[in-house]
């Protein structure tokens, strides 16, 4: 029968090979009402041969107690290992965070000290320039051989230019 075709009412249970539960029915013609309930009526006939095999339908076979205990023990060990690994990971992360915090504080302190040192050096430079400018009018050294701080460039660049 093709999909979408209407079944022929004259079909008998015996004429259809392998209809599952209907195979135990007599091969006489069945009405549509009988066909509806044939599965339900013959379920007992289907289960009866399986009964001697001690097959329980709808239930899984229960594992042996020792298998359950072993499985439970494995789960406990796995959970315990996972718990220890998670604690180790949290501790490592905490230590790393603390290290980075200390390093950040150290670098901020160093940065502040360097900025202070820069300000002190700028102030010292200003004082030296002021002293030099005060001394210049009374200086007996030739002025064309002395450079003024304002006309000074970068001494490293000047040395490179000479080469």
UniProtKB/Swiss-Prot annotation:
Linked residues for Glycyl lysine isopeptide (Lys-Gly) (interchain with G-Cter in SUMO2): 65
Keyword entries, A-Z: DNA-binding, Isopeptide bond, Nucleus, Phosphoprotein, Repressor, Transcription, Transcription regulation, Ubl conjugation
Biological processes per GO annotation: chromatin remodeling; fat cell differentiation; negative regulation of fat cell differentiation; negative regulation of transcription by RNA polymerase II; regulation of transcription by RNA polymerase II
UniProt entry tagged with the keyword Methyltransferase: no
Processing after translation: Phosphorylation of Thr-148 by MAPK8 in response to different stress conditions such as, UV irradiation, oxidatives stress and anisomycin treatments.
Gene Ontology CC terms: nucleus; RNA polymerase II transcription regulator complex
Subcellular compartments: Nucleus
Region (Basic motif): 74-96
Top-level taxon in the UniProt lineage: Eukaryota
GO molecular function, one term: histone deacetylase binding
Domain named bZIP: residues: 72-135
Region feature Disordered, mapped onto this chain: 1-20, 59-89
Sites bearing Phosphothreonine, chain numbering: 148
Annotated segments matching region Leucine-zipper: 100-128
Matches recorded under InterPro entries: AP-1, bZIP, bZIP_sf
Assembly, per entry: Interacts with IRF2BP1. Forms homodimer or heterodimer with JUN, JUNB, JUND, CEBPG and ATF2 thereby inhibiting transactivation by JUN, ATF2 and CEBPG. Binds multiple DNA elements such as cAMP-response element (CRE) and TPA response element (TRE) either as homodimer or heterodimer.
Role according to the record: Component of the AP-1 transcription factor that represses transactivation mediated by the Jun family of proteins. Involved in a variety of transcriptional responses associated with AP-1, such as UV-induced apoptosis, cell differentiation, tumorigenesis and antitumogeneris. Can also function as a repressor by recruiting histone deacetylase 3/HDAC3 to the promoter region of JUN. May control transcription via direct regulation of the modification of histones and the assembly of chromatin.
Similarity remark: Belongs to the bZIP family. ATF subfamily.
UniProt name for this protein: Jun dimerization protein 2
């Amino acid at each position: 029968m093709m999909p979408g075709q209407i079944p022929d009412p004259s079909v008998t249970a015996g004429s259809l090979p392998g209809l599952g539960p209907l195979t135990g029915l007599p091969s006489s013609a069945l009405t549509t009402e009988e066909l509806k309930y044939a599965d339900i009526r013959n379920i007992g006939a289907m289960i009866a041969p399986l009964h001697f095999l001690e097959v329980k339908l709808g239930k899984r076979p229960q594992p042996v107690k020792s298998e359950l205990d072993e499985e439970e023990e494995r789960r406990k060990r796995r959970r315990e290992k996972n718990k220890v690994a998670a604690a180790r990971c949290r501790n490592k992360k905490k230590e790393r965070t603390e290290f980075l915090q200390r390093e950040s504080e150290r670098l901020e302190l160093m940065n502040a000290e360097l900025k202070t040192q820069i300000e002190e050096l700028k102030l010292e430079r200003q004082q030296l320039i002021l002293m030099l400018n005060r001394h210049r009018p009374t200086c007996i050294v030739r002025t064309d051989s002395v450079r003024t701080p304002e006309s000074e460039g970068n001494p490293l660049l000047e040395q490179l230019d000479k080469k």
